[in-house]
Amino acid sequence: MPKRFQGNVISASAITPASVVESASAKGVWSLAEQAVFAGAGDWPVPGLSQVNGFFAGRLDFSGANTINEIDFVTEGNATDFGDLTVSRGAIAGFSSSTRGVWGGGFTGSAWSNVIDYITMSSAGNATDFGDLSSVRAAPAGSSNNTRGLFSGGSDATTNARSNIIEYVTIASTGNTTDFGDLTVARRYGQGCGSSTRSLCFAGGSLDSGSSNVIDYVTIGSTGNATDFGDLSSARDSVGSCSNTTRAIFAGGASTNTIEFVTIASTGNATDFGDIRVSAGGSCCASSLTAVFAYSGSNEIQKVSIATTGDATDFGDTTTDNNGAGISNGHGGLS
């Protein structure tokens, strides 16, 4: 048996490794045999591997829910309860920086909402009021880099007309939205994601022409109207979307189980990636490696490896079947 020098060069108390994430590093002297034991148990820190968590809040549809579920991308498995939104609602949009998650808009089940909430992702608890959208609006799309978050499109409460409005907030502050520009096509239940420089908004429902297959993009650090990027293979709404720094992934929709992807830095039509296990609308959040999908009406969570192609596999379960807008502290807009 190898000799064990368990201890810390500063403290006499032993500090044992307990996670694969880099931030869990424990100071001390360990034999190679002990390192192998810790690594086999998933407890030896890996340089460069950061803790990444995802969150799903509210509901996808026009029913009200205030639940916030949290998942761990490193360990995978079932979600845990994080806290509650300030107002119970569905059809909300979400985005995040590396430290703060934001959700806005939606429908309470009886009234439209312009409320924007935020959480500090490292600390479980209920959401806090951030500010307001320019108008009460349901089913906008959300996207962000580490500085700005965008709300794009949605349904106007007064006329039920689809909106082409893009608004933004500075995530590290609080306050009401500011006008950014317009989408090329007015829509609700579109979805958003992107890189640190580009924000994509795609698909969604148009009151006059049904669902849309249009993909738009904007340069997130500036302001102005969106530009056409390309098309999905079919028109649909309620698509789950997320990205790493290179690829944007779109999965499902109201009547399809198709997963498609685009390369964010280019333009063009979407390419087939694989299939999710159900044909349904859903939400998505991502780390640099993994895209995770959840669906209203089901507590099943599925995953794919973003850099490859193929069908989704099981990740775990959420605490409820609500599973509204998804965000994370490791998505492609943050690098």
Stretches found by the model and what they are:
Residues 1-335:
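Polar, enzyme-active/binding microenvironments
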